[in-house]
Design a protein with these regions (language model features):
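Bacterial N-terminal signal peptides
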Residues: 9-19
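Gly/Pro-enriched, hydrophobic low-complexity segments
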Residues: 131, 154-235
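N-terminal leader/targeting segments and the immediate start of mature chains
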Residues: 22-85, 230-235
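N-terminal mature ectodomain segment of secretory-pathway/periplasmic proteins
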Residues: 64-122
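Short, solvent-exposed helix-to-loop capping segments enriched in aromatics
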Residues: 64, 141-156
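Bacterial N-terminal signal peptides that target proteins for export
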Residues: 1-8
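A mature extracytoplasmic/lumenal domain signature
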Residues: 76-78, 99, 105-109, 117-119, ...
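Acidic/charged, solvent-exposed loop-and-adjacent secondary-structure segments enriched in E/D, K/R, S/T
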Residues: 122-148
Length: 235
């Protein structure tokens, strides 16, 4: 359970503020309620089904296959109904092909999450913790879902998830639902908003249940620029 708690509290790289135990590190809190849910994922009237889903997925696969690195600023907004408020954090996001991810939280406190292959590292208050997802099917699914959602690359999802694709005048909306009941006990669904022009991820929201969510907004994105390998250091 400790290993599962770590990867889930990693927040699917989104819920880093609170683990299954409810333990937390400081986060800037703002007032917020579920009345803002429509702004999180858009209203139903804003979106319609993509006419040619196969063509869309082909274009998306083409775009993501051309990527070697992604760098961006992010703002994480976490809502927990038990507190009836939003908690915000900011930092830098890094991704490198293949399967290297770093979330470098900078405010309100320093915190780091690194995924490098089947290894995961978290650094909190200068103390590093490590877990290995190899040989654990559920944790492997979690890691795959993280990478796919953060980069917009759906090719690795396979048959373990259902994917619904919709569009509006502003963006594409992908709703990803795990088929595994075990996974859904912790992650109800993922909603991704993609930029219509370059199909990059503008927003990623994880719904832990009907009322709690963690949302990432990405800005100042850079593609295929060199990233120092120290960013993904597992030591």
């Amino acid at each position: 359970m400790k290993r599962l708690s770590i990867i889930l509290s990693i927040g699917m790289l989104m819920a880093a503020q609170f683990g299954l135990s409810g333990a937390a590190f400081p986060s800037a809190a703002t007032s917020g309620t579920m009345s803002g849910m429509a702004s999180v994922q858009g209203t139903a009237a804003d979106y319609k089904a993509v006419a040619d889903k196969a063509a869309f997925r082909k274009e998306l696969a083409s775009k993501t296959s051309a990527l070697t690195t992604i760098q961006a600023k992010f703002v994480q907004t976490k809502y927990l109904s038990v507190f009836s408020r939003e908690m915000k954090s900011e930092g830098r996001f890094y991704w490198q092909k293949t399967d290297k991810i770093c979330l470098d939280y900078r405010t309100p406190v320093a915190y780091e999450i690194v995924i490098n292959g089947d290894k995961i590292k978290t650094v909190n208050a200068g103390k590093a913790s490590f877990i290995d997802t190899k040989g654990n099917p559920m944790m492997d699914q979690m890691s795959t879902l993280i990478t796919s959602c953060m980069t917009g690359d759906l090719t690795k999802l396979g048959t373990d998830f259902t994917v619904n694709v919709e569009e509006s005048s502003a963006d594409y909306r992908l709703t990803i639902v795990p088929k595994s009941k075990t996974v859904r006990a912790y992650i109800d669904k993922m909603v991704i908003l993609l930029n219509r022009k370059d199909l990059s991820v503008n927003r990623l929201t994880m719904y832990e249940n009907a009322s709690d969510y963690t949302m990432y907004d990405f800005t100042d994105k850079k593609f295929n620029a060199a990233i120092p390998q120290t960013v993904f250091n597992m030591r």
